[in-house]
Amino acid sequence: MDIPTVPRQITVHLGAPNANAENITLPFNEYIKNVASSEIYPTWPKEAIIANILAQISFTLNRIYTEYYRSRGYDFDITSTTQYDHAFKKNGEIFSNISQTVDEIFNNYIVRDGNIEPLFAQFCDGVRTRCNGLSQWGSVELANSGMTALEILKSYYGDNISLVTDAPVGENIPSYPGTPLSRGDFGEEVYRIKIQLNRIGKNYPAIPEIPYTNAAFDAPTEEAVKTFQRIFNLTPDGIVGKSTWYKIKEIYAGVKQLSELTGEGLTISEAQRVYPRALVPGTAAEAVR
């Protein structure tokens, strides 16, 4: 998993995940404007509006970063139903002050100190429903008492959070490399798979530990992949095709609790690219040590 970026576009499913509903793709900032205009009121104090929008951005980026839906076989990034995600209304009204605020902060998001994934910033209205995250109406009271947006967020998510500001914007590219990985392959993707399988193995000890976490798809890697595939009812061929790739990603995100408010999280060292380019036989030895 790479360092997070803010996608230029997002695909929204207009219904529950399994519902036969339309998918629409739109610019990320336009999506957040729609969500914010559907979830909160433009008459709220500015700091409450900012706090709520930051929570909405962070929640959305967490869904995209973990490929929560795509790793489960869906062809969208998020749904439009509050049972699973945010409120979103196709062609919904956008309030001007909310639109302006989103344009100012759409590439800012919340992180837990020491972690790099966007916080799974749950929220609820605080009146009809309650949750462990931000209370929308409660944020209004806190803003009226003089709190800043960050102070409001810390009051709900804990003091050990901070904001990433001016995050890079890029394309929303699926993580699957496009071709299956198998014994004899080299590269960053192989390295990531080995790291992830070793972490998954702490929760599923039947998966043998891979002793050398470098960029080579070797025999121990193949055996670990086969065991993983058996556990999760995939064809145990030792090849990391699309279904195995995304199942590994799904289970890794689960054991790391990346889509929970208080999870293990992902450190920057776990997300940095170790091998900046694809490796092929004959690559200089320094790059594969």
Positions of the model-derived regions?
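Conserved, single-site charged/polar hotspot
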Residues: 1-289
